[in-house]
Amino acid sequence: MARLSEIAEEANEVKSRFLANMSYNIRIPLNNVVGFSQLLSTDMGLDDKEKLEYSEIIQANSTDLIQLVNDVLDLSRLEAKMMKFQIQDCEIREICNDLIYMARRDSNGHIHAELESDVEHQMLRMDANRFNQAVLSMLIYPVPNDTDREVKMQLSKDEENQLLIFRIINSPLVDPAFASQQVSIRLKINQLLFEHFGGSFMVSESAEDGYPITFSIATL
């Protein structure tokens, strides 16, 4: 709980600093997009290799810029309880298997994700897209990385409290090596999302156990 409180406080501080300096944070990728776009359109002496390199820079910075803005908007909507959800019936074991596949695919095979589940079949009513986005963020690297990594997702059911309990071990998202403003905001988004659906979200301080993330969602 102490770690979760720290995450919440850090995320609030980060968001405040981010909003106060949004023009600076946006300016860097925006300037790269504009600058390299101008080079592509005006410098007739560029060879094919340089054109490809500049195009990749433009694409990467455009993606970063969009993600940066979307995360802050999502966080603001969740905190104001104005987030719109698309609720549907979902089978959780099927969704988890899909997430394991997506983690391997999106990391080009560098994330060796594995699912351990005591739950054979469980239907939930939730926003599957939001759920997938949150869980996938905990399975893959928050920034491009080609290091092989074992990540395990465990799924169990708390019958008494009518909760599904998830535990992700060795998540790159809480690895101190990848700490950043965007990671702190993503963690806060995940916390608010699971709390909205009647669950909880907690990050352990134990480095020895791979900083496990435990979160839950109500089965009602």
Which stretches of residues belong to each language-model region?
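A conserved beta-strand-to-alpha-helix junction within the catalytic ATP-binding
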Residues: Q86-Y101, N132
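Detector for a conserved hydrophobic position within an alpha-helical segment of the HATPase_c
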Residues: N190-F194
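Primarily the dimerization/phosphotransfer
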Residues: A2-T42
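Helix-loop junction within the histidine kinase core
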Residues: V72, S76-I87
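Short acidic helix/loop segment immediately C-terminal to the autophosphorylated histidine
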Residues: S41-K49
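Glycine-rich ATP-binding loops of the HATPase_c
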Residues: G198-E205
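Short alpha-helical segment of the dimerization/phosphotransfer core of two-component systems
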Residues: A60-L65
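Conserved catalytic submotifs in the C-terminal HATPase_c
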Residues: Q86-E91, H110-Q122, D158
